[in-house]
Amino acid sequence: ASAAGAVRAGDDETLLNPVLNSLDNLVSGL
């Protein structure tokens, strides 16, 4: 989650946010 959070913090691509959020959920579920 922290990795994707860092990406979101430095990226204005709002369309990627849902994708990164999904990756956060997958990683936290492992």
From Swiss-Prot:
The modification Leucine amide is found at L30. Signal peptide: none annotated. One of its GO terms (cellular component) is extracellular region. Keywords: Amidation, Amphibian defense peptide, Secreted. Transmembrane segments: none annotated. It is found in: Secreted. Expressed by the skin dorsal glands. One of its GO terms (biological process) is defense response. The keyword Manganese does not apply. Lacks antimicrobial activity. Does not inhibit the formation of NO by neuronal nitric oxide. Belongs to the frog skin active peptide (FSAP) family. Rothein subfamily. This is Rothein 3.3. It comes from Litoria rothii (Roth's tree frog).
